Every structure is written in structure tokens, then in C-alpha cells.
């Protein structure tokens, strides 16, 4: 590939709304160009990177035994009504009508189409298991598309759907896909973690996310120093707290006239924040609930929603708080409410003694509070908090927090979609059985941005070698003025290609400084310079993208550096 014949358009300036490094560098490198909000054209350069990611994903999916299909991007409302997702998916689902006023959606995911295809094609348990995958454009009508292709409305995704007769077989394929994903991200050269996760709108039981580790990641992850345990903070749990100590203080009322937060109360009383308890008032269809977490902890909304009877909870308003507690936010507590209420205590709160809570009186808190003496034991004890850095892990290690960008997700869906769409097969006894489903997604276009977030420096992108648009670019100095140098550079390019090395020739005739800056911006792993001086000495100037300086190598030394 000669860059004089390739559309390469780099820039020094980037739009002010490009917040993430990946967005800025992809625009500067000319990988993408904005068409409309959340919609991007991939340039020839960007497409080379995208196709390299796609190729590795396809190879590993085929290796894992999945078979490729292609579902329509436009799907009829009836399928989505059957699963209940036409309304449940919300505003992100782009709904359209054809000339006959029939309703369709531009799919953000394809569980419905996959289940319908399986219903049409699979009729016997002997055909199972089967795993269909596609690499297809998806669309989600984000309220605020941002961060370039990281959160675009249109994106390229690999989504796979497996079908099984039994839960055990579904679990085996889940493990098979998990192993395939580990191979994919390892081959791409990314630092990543597989973490336990919530199933979200997709639903199902077992669920794991794959995150590229990056400081700019939107997701907070917890991992243990004692094992390979890792989880999204949404689902991560710390070890069980130590048993509750005996009471050592008497109950006392203390004035806290302006102290409404646990931090302010702890400072006033000269106590550790861990001695205070935060009271969060919520309402459910069953009534008023007071949720208690330690003062230095935060409620985990996803965990709380999974507690029995809490799926539909919302924050209580001031009128509801006064009705049940006779007080106002900042001074709430579980001791002697106006009316009987349900109390949900986080596990750490349930094992506390001599703690501090609001007194349900404005400007007053209680100290020396103890379970069983000053208030009944909590009706419900559950893990309803976010873990924090340094928490004890259940494996004996410590939990550490980092940030990540989700690029893959695997689910065990069970029979949810197959049952809704009546996707059944005849089992060994000739009876109809609803198939079990697994679902496995990878955001291919998102991987490109995530890789840049993880791998860049002040000069530009630093691609992992498998993702780079070219492994090597041969830079020729003054190609139009020096035919001998141009010919030598062309010969070297042909030799590199013949050796199986993905290479390009920069024969655009730019000044050396501008040419080298482009190669650094583009993240080319290896740069080779052909010049008149080098030819006279029988050497080429070689520099790796991450090296501090260049070195002169003969041809044998050059090919050795390139791994050949």
C-alpha cells in the first residue's frame, strides 16, 4: 500500500466537544468523521483498524464452534411485543413505520430475531446445541450521544445467540464463549478483566462483562488481590463483616443543629465516620421502607432493587417522610418511628454496636444506639451497598477499585425469549420443550476507542500491534527528487509484503518532521526510513513507536527486529 494512493487526512485541530482522548485522536488521525449526532463515517484508515478487530473476533467465534448468520437490522413490532421489549426498551429503541403503516424497529440487539430464526429452523433436540452469531450494525437512540464512537447511536457489534435443551448445556456454552472472549481480548493485546455483572435490560441469570482497563472508563470495577475474583461495582460484594460486638455505651440524645450529613455529625462528635449510620427513606407498593447503610458507604441501587419487595422502590418525598418518621431529611433514623416501618439494614450496619443515627427530630441525633436494646433487630439484612477500596474480599484478599470500559458481555438467558416466541423442540420423549438461550455480545467499534483510551501518549495513538492499520510504514525522504531512494523504498516494501508483514509506504513527499509526526499520531508500531545517506551506508533508520530513539540497521537486522 502506497500512501500517495491512500486517503490519509490528519489534522492538528480537534473540535471542542471531543472530550475523550480516543475521540480527539480518532478525529485528528482521520479515522472517523461526524455525519450527525452519534453517527460517524469510518475512513479507509479507520476501517482498516475496524476490520482487524472484526477478523480476530470472527476467527475466534468460528474456532469456538459458532456459525455466522445475518439477521435484518429492521425487525417487526410483533416480535418485540411478544417479549415485552417494545415498550420496556424505552426511548433508545428507534421505531419506524413503512408505507403500509406497519411498525418496525431498528434493532439495538437481536434476541427476538434469533429466537424466531431458531423457532423456524430447529425442531429436534438432536440439532442442539447451536450457536449463531452475526457482525452487524446496531442502533440505539441515545439521549446524549457523546465520546465519539464510544457512545455513538450507530455502532458495529458482534452478537451471538446459542440454543440448548438443558440448563447444563447452556452453562457449558457460556463457559465456551467466555473462553473465546478471553482469547479475543488477549489476541487484541488489551489489558482487560472479566467481571461479574448485572444482566440489565437483557435479563437472564449468570452474566459477565469484559472491560478494557482505562482511567476514563465509565464503569467502576472491583477485583481481589487474593484471587481472580472481579466484578462490576454494581454487583461486587465484600466479605461478611465480623460478628457484632457487645454494647458498650448508653443511648444519648445530642444536639446537631446544623449537622445534616454523616460527615458533619462525625466531625462534631469527634467520631470515625464508620460509627455513623445513614438512613434513606424509600417507598414501594407495599409501603414505607427505611434503608440503613454505614455513614462511609453508599447504597447500591441495583442490589437494593433485588431485595424482596423492593423492585419498584423510589425515594420517599418529604410528606411521606413526615407521615412515617415525623422528621425531615438529615435527621432520620430507625429508632421509634411514628408508624411501624420496614427496616432494611446493610450487613455492615446489622453488625454494628454503639452507632449514631438521626433521632427523627430536627437538630438531634442519637449516639450509643444498639440493636435489640434501643430498637428491634432489622426485619431484613442484606448486602445493599457499594464496595469500597480496601474492603476485605471473601477469598481473603483485599478489594481494589479500578475503572473500565465495557466491550463485551455474556449472558445465560434461560427460556425468557424462547418461551415468549414459542421456540420449542421435541425432546428425547417426543414432548415439546422450550429451548434455553445464551447471548454473547462484543462492541467491535467500541473496542477501537477503548484500545486508544488504554494505549496513547502525548504524540498520539500507541496501537497494540494486532490492531494497528499497518505493522510497518516505510518512510521515504524526497521520493520525487531522488529516484534511487524511491526505488529502494519500493523494493523494501515489496520484500516486507512478501515476508507476510503488513506494510505501507509513505511516499507522499512530506517533510520528514511532518511525516514522522503522522506516523506517531497514527500509532504505527514500526517506522523505517529510507534515505540517501542510509543507502550509502547500507542501512535503514528504524524506530519502534514506543522507543525513545532510532537506530540504524542493515536489512537482516531490520527483518530480525520485525520478528522475521
UniProtKB/Swiss-Prot annotation:
UniProt keyword annotation of Aminoacyl-tRNA synthetase present: yes
Domain of life: Bacteria
EC annotation from Swiss-Prot or TrEMBL: 6.1.1.15
Xref: InterPro entries: aa-tRNA-synt_IIb, aa-tRNA-synth_II, aa-tRNA-synth_II/BPL/LPL, Anticodon-bd, Anticodon-bd_dom_sf, Pro-tRNA-ligase_IIa, Pro-tRNA-synth_IIa_bac-type, Pro-tRNA-Synthase_IIa_type1
Enzyme class, spelled out: ligase
Locations listed in the record: Cytoplasm
A biological-process GO annotation: prolyl-tRNA aminoacylation
GO molecular function: aminoacyl-tRNA deacylase activity; ATP binding; proline-tRNA ligase activity
UniProt keyword terms in alphabetical order: Aminoacyl-tRNA synthetase, ATP-binding, Cytoplasm, Ligase, Nucleotide-binding, Protein biosynthesis
Broad class of the protein's primary localization: cytoplasm
Function: Catalyzes the attachment of proline to tRNA(Pro) in a two-step reaction: proline is first activated by ATP to form Pro-AMP and then transferred to the acceptor end of tRNA(Pro). As ProRS can inadvertently accommodate and process non-cognate amino acids such as alanine and cysteine, to avoid such errors it has two additional distinct editing activities against alanine. One activity is designated as 'pretransfer' editing and involves the tRNA(Pro)-independent hydrolysis of activated Ala-AMP.
HAMAP family referenced in this protein's UniProt entry, alphabetically: Pro_tRNA_synth_type1
Domains (record comment): Consists of three domains: the N-terminal catalytic domain, the editing domain and the C-terminal anticodon-binding domain.
Name of the protein described by the UniProt record: Proline--tRNA ligase
